[in-house]
């Protein structure tokens, strides 16, 4: 990956450590951390972004679209935990023969997620899925606070019927009165 003028490849490497979990080394092709939970709701493709139409809707993304490393725990009692760290938020989605440049005023980012399928040995709960995730990006400028993102929700599948509820939020860390804090 270092043969392209000291630029990184837009690659992902998955390492399965058997009973110890999984490790994913990712150069920003998204899907890691809370980015995996940005929209877990049941869909009939009614969302505009489901048809590749731009909406301006701010979904949580966390460390996912940045160069990152994610550890996924083995599933125990229906629960899976992931921890994702991005050493420099803003260095992301890099194509071959390209580079992302400086990450700006942001430092490292980290995500923690928990996904639970609490079947408890019953057939009726086999379709229940609970999820929660949080992200924090460290700002390196003294006039800005850290950025925080969070998401949580549940889905329930029973036969062909799928129901869900989720909520997410973003605190940008911006100090100026005219800046939007989602």
Describe every region a protein language model picked out.
Residues 1-182:
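Outer-membrane beta-barrel proteins
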């Amino acid at each position: 990956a270092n043969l392209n003028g000291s630029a990184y490849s837009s690659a992902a490497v998955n390492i399965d450590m058997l009973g110890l979990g999984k490790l994913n080394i990712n150069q920003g092709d998204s899907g890691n951390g809370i980015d995996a939970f940005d929209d877990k709701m049941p869909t009939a493709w009614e969302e505009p972004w489901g048809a590749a139409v731009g909406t301006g809707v701010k979904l949580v993304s966390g460390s996912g679209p940045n160069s990152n490393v994610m550890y996924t725990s083995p599933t125990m009692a229906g629960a899976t935990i992931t921890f994702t760290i991005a050493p420099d938020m803003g260095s992301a989605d890099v194509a071959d023969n390209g580079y992302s440049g400086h990450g700006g005023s942001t430092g490292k980012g980290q995500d923690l997620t928990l996904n639970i399928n609490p079947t408890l040995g019953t057939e009726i709960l086999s379709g229940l899925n609970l999820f929660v995730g949080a992200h924090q990006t460290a700002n390196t400028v003294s006039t800005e606070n850290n950025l925080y993102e969070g998401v949580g929700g549940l889905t329930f599948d029973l036969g062909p019927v799928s129901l869900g509820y989720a909520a997410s939020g973003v605190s940008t860390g911006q100090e100026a009165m005219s800046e939007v804090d989602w």
